[in-house]
């Protein structure tokens, strides 16, 4: 059993070796074919170039002498032969180099296979790590070879064109920011100046108002002029209004409050309005009664009902009969006259009513009717 197993293992190893050798041979054959194809292409390209060169020389040498053209053709042929020989030698050298490289690759592959067979008994982790490192190293070496094989191509446009000069112009964004900062600074300065001017004007107005309130507005204005301060028309107007307020306060005893504009309010009219307000809203005293109020209260129409209605309409309070007895002789005479007048008015009203409603007159004409009214 042990011998059979050993023989089977050896047979498998020989089969794997044969397969790998066959693969290696096929790869070498492909590489050779590829290199031969490249060589043929290069030969064709060189031959095409030579044919073109010959055609150009034939065209250029038509008008020249035959002796010169023959000597040149001989020289050209000798040169072309030398070039072909040198190219063939370089191709042979390249082929020999490629063969040596292929041999080295085959040797390295066989060595790798032997190493893999030996390291199968070791741990899987080590085996994986080594295989990864080998694959990475192979890929890196291939990349290096490709880089070496590729010639460096320098772009003529980049080499010929000079580098652009550095920017020496103005930056518009920075200029705009600087201009904005300058404008803001100017606006701040102007605002500060205006605030200072307003404060100075207010101080001058306060000084003028205080001077006018003391009573000598003209003298104070003269003092301001003497001191050297500029007296504006506003200050002069404020001084005049302060003088008027002081005069109204001395006459009426009513001062204009500070929340009113002194230039827009007349102090005399304001004092009159305040007096009227006090008269309206103050409480009435019991003893104070005017003559007209007494006359309307004592008015008598000759009929008690009419007297009561009239007093209710006028808002007069009813008085006692005892108070009515104590009346002066003059007032009694006036009351009698009022009663007679009201009686005559009632009679005339009734006569006019009878004429208008019944359309009948007293007598034949207008005079008789008027006499009848008089007799009544």
Swiss-Prot record:
Q: Does the keyword Protein transport apply?
A: no
User: Where is there biased composition of kind Basic and acidic residues?
Assistant: 13-52
List residues modified as Phosphoserine.
Answer: 45, 318
Q: Where is the composition biased (Basic residues)?
A: 53-155
Q: Which Pfam families match?
A: SMAP (PF15477)
UniProt KW Transcription keyword: no
Region annotated Disordered sits at 1-171
Q: Which part of the chain holds the cross-link Glycyl lysine isopeptide (Lys-Gly) (interchain with G-Cter in SUMO1)?
A: 317
Which keywords appear in this protein's UniProt record, sorted alphabetically? Coiled coil, Isopeptide bond, Phosphoprotein, Ubl conjugation
Q: Which InterPro entries match?
A: SMAP_dom
Q: Where is this cross-link: Glycyl lysine isopeptide (Lys-Gly) (interchain with G-Cter in SUMO2)?
A: 317
**Residue runs in coiled coils:** 171-214
To which protein family does this belong? Belongs to the RSRC2 family.
Name of this protein: Arginine/serine-rich coiled-coil protein 2
The protein's organism comes out as: Mus musculus
Quick one: which gene encodes this? Rsrc2
């Amino acid at each position: 059993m042990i011998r059979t197993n050993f023989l089977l293992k050896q047979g498998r190893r020989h089969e794997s070796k044969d397969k790998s050798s066959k693969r290696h041979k096929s790869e070498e054959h492909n590489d050779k074919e590829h290199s031969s194809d490249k060589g043929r292409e290069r030969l064709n390209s060189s031959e095409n170039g030579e044919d073109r060169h010959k055609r150009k020389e034939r065209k250029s040498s038509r008008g020249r002498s035959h002796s010169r053209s023959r000597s040149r053709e001989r020289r050209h042929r000798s040169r072309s032969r030398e070039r072909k020989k040198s190219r063939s030698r370089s191709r042979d050298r390249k082929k020999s180099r490629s063969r040596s490289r292929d041999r080295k690759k085959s040797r390295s592959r066989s060595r790798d296979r032997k190493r893999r067979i030996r390291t199968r008994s070791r741990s899987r982790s080590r085996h994986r790590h080594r295989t990864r490192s080998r694959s990475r190293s192979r890929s890196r070496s291939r990349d290096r070879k490709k880089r070496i094989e590729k010639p460096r191509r320098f772009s003529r446009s980049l080499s010929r064109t000079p580098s652009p000069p550095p920017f020496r112009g103005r930056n518009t964004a920075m200029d705009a920011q600087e201009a904005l900062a300058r404008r803001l600074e100017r606006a701040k300065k102007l605002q500060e100046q205006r605030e200072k001017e307003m404060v100075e004007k207010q101080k001058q107005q306060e000084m003028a108002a205080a001077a006018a309130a003391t009573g000598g507005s003209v003298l104070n204005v003269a003092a301001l002029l003497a001191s050297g301060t500029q007296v504006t028309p506003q200050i002069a107007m404020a001084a005049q209004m302060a003088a008027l307020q002081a005069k109204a306060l001395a006459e009426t005893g009513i001062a204009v409050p500070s929340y009113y504009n002194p230039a827009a309010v007349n102090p005399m009219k304001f004092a009159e309005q305040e007096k009227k307000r006090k008269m309206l809203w103050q409480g009435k005293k019991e003893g104070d009664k005017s003559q007209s109020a007494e006359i309307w209260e004592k008015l008598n129409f000759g009929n008690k009902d009419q007297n009561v209605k009239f007093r209710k309409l006028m808002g007069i309070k009813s008085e006692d009969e005892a108070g009515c007895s104590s009346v002066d002789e003059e007032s009694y005479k006036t009351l009698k006259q009022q009663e007679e007048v009201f009686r005559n008015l009632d009679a005339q009203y009734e006569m006019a009513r009878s004429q208008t409603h019944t359309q009948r007159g007293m007598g034949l004409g207008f005079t008789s009717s008027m006499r009848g009214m008089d007799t009544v």
